[in-house]
Regions:
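Cross-kingdom TIR/SEFIR domain
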Residues: 3-5, 15-97
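Acidic, metal-ion-coordinating active-site neighborhood of RNase H-like domains
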Residues: 7-9
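Donor nucleotide-sugar binding loop of glycosyltransferases
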Residues: 12
Length: 97
């Protein structure tokens, strides 16, 4: 089972990567979209890992607040009581979903 599911905008990948690396170095199994096998249905694969994860970290930026995928993944994680929101930059309340 995945410990932590990462939800973020692909535009933020390089800002999220060091966090992923640090958590992995501490022994956490981190799932992020770079692990989706070629030919696999992306939506199904992502949803399965999100639901099975112990927690989900949504990384918020000016880009990710506009991403339907990030917003949906955060909503699902919140409904399951396992959402951890991380601000990558200052945002206003009005920018959040």
């Amino acid at each position: 089972m995945t410990d932590i599911f990462f939800s973020y905008s692909s535009a933020d990948r390089e800002r999220v990567r060091p966090i992923r690396d640090a958590l992995a170095a501490q022994g956490f199994e981190v799932f992020w979209d770079q692990q989706v096998p070629a030919g696999m249905d992306w939506d199904t694969w992502i949803r399965q890992h999100l639901i099975k994860s112990k927690c989900a970290m949504a990384f918020w930026s000016a880009t990710s607040v506009s991403s339907d995928n990030v917003r949906h993944e955060a909503m699902v994680a919140k409904q399951q009581g396992k959402l951890i929101s991380v601000l990558l930059e200052p945002l206003t309340v009005e920018q959040f979903p």
